[in-house]
Amino acid sequence: MSTPDAQAAALHAPVLAQRCVDLLAPALESDGAVLVDATLGMGGHSELVLEQCPHARVLGIDRDPRALELATARLARFGQRFTPVHAVYDEIDDVARQHAGGAVQGVLFDLGVSSLQLDDAGRGFAYAQDAPLDMRMDPTTGPTAADLLADADEAELRRILRTYGEEKFAPRIAAAIVRRREAAPLRRSSDLVEVVRGAIPMSAQRTGGHPAKRTFQALRIAVNRELEVLERALPRAIDALAVGGRIVVESYHSLEDRLVKRELARGATSSAPRHLPVVPEEDQPYLELLTHGAEQADDVELAANPRAASVRLRAARRIRTTPTRPSPRRRRP
């Protein structure tokens, strides 16, 4: 592990880490209890769980080989209580079967791009740093952001920007990208920032932060198929929970939080018609919500960790088993 990586791990403050542990800990008290950290990153959340829940072991999933290497070194002192797994988190059911016999006591998702990826100028995630337009969370597989910008037609670019970036100037930006690539390909983040700045009216650039923020978010989500992966992962994670197990999800924009809210609410609501005098067992809720709406970072957390500003945390507990539901077709992003 390089010195810069070691420094990054030491400085990285996981968001709402203690709150996550407090929510998960009641399910991790028995010997051999298993937590799946589905978004391992630099291992900050897992480290706190392993320190405060001495009977638990952690399966740490990440699609980024560099993050796995970094977290494995950080958590080496816990020995066999920590197992790194190179996978995408919609493979959580397979990971649970292979490493925990199918049922786990806790699942944690800390969604979005990690500090490691944001702070590495060479990955192309940050609009404030010039770098090749890559944006892949796993840099060993799949098309890059530059590939997407070169291959997608104007309508598809418009859809990506509007859907994943909630960008109201999506038509103007998509048209500008197509015009620019006819002259020269967009290969670097500075190329894309220049196009976005030229497409958005100056009056709109004076508010709302960096004008390319939403475009970069949209491309990152599209390149990594983040919402598709999350939509598959959430029901699989819930199905992998043993009764009494807990799931905690931290999301960082409304698109993620909407999916999380919907999936947890579905599990916490009866599926029976309202007029039935008795709710059949198979229609009874299988989750109990542990948070009232989405929790946010308080002033103390924000002062220590500004990246917590957009976090929305939701949690639930598995209260009964559910009939086996059909598994959506898996497609590796």
Curated annotation (Swiss-Prot):
Gene3D superfamilies: Putative methyltransferase TM0872, insert domain, Vaccinia Virus protein VP39. S-adenosyl-L-methionine binds at residues 43-45, 62, 89, 110, 117. Keywords: Cytoplasm, Methyltransferase, rRNA processing, S-adenosyl-L-methionine, Transferase. GO terms for molecular function: rRNA (cytosine-N4-)-methyltransferase activity. It is found in: Cytoplasm. It is an enzyme of class 2 (transferase). One of its GO terms (cellular component) is cytoplasm. InterPro entries: RsmH, SAM-dep_MeTrfase_MraW_recog, SAM-dependent_MTases_sf. SUPFAM superfamilies: Putative methyltransferase TM0872, insert domain, S-adenosyl-L-methionine-dependent methyltransferases. Residues 312-333 are annotated as: Disordered. Its EC number is 2.1.1.199. Its main location: cytoplasm. The keyword Methyltransferase applies. Specifically methylates the N4 position of cytidine in position 1402 (C1402) of 16S rRNA. PANTHER family: 12S RRNA N4-METHYLCYTIDINE METHYLTRANSFERASE, S-ADENOSYL-METHYLTRANSFERASE MRAW. This is Ribosomal RNA small subunit methyltransferase H. It comes from Beutenbergia cavernae (strain ATCC BAA-8 / DSM 12333 / CCUG 43141 / JCM 11478 / NBRC 16432 / NCIMB 13614 / HKI 0122).
